[in-house]
Amino acid sequence: DGTLGAHTATGAIVSESSMGVAVPMSMPNYRSYFGRSVEISYGGRTVVAVVNDCGGLGGGSRALDLQPGVWKALGASSCFDWGVRTVSYRFL
């Protein structure tokens, strides 16, 4: 998600270990999700991340944009390795 070292919509700095996600700006009241935890599952792994950003996300065709710590925890070695995948998620 974003560029390493960049600030998210909530002011967090994106790093290799960032456990944040972005929600689409097309989501109604998307700002109300900032600070909420979201449980994300893929391939038998489950992680909890925090909504700290927003974006276009493929014109609204994607539900979440994962920061590096999240996709690494779900088993990917790089952003290019992760790409676009279907995950299960729920807001906590």
Can you name each region flagged by the protein language model?
Residues 1-92:
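Secreted/periplasmic proteins
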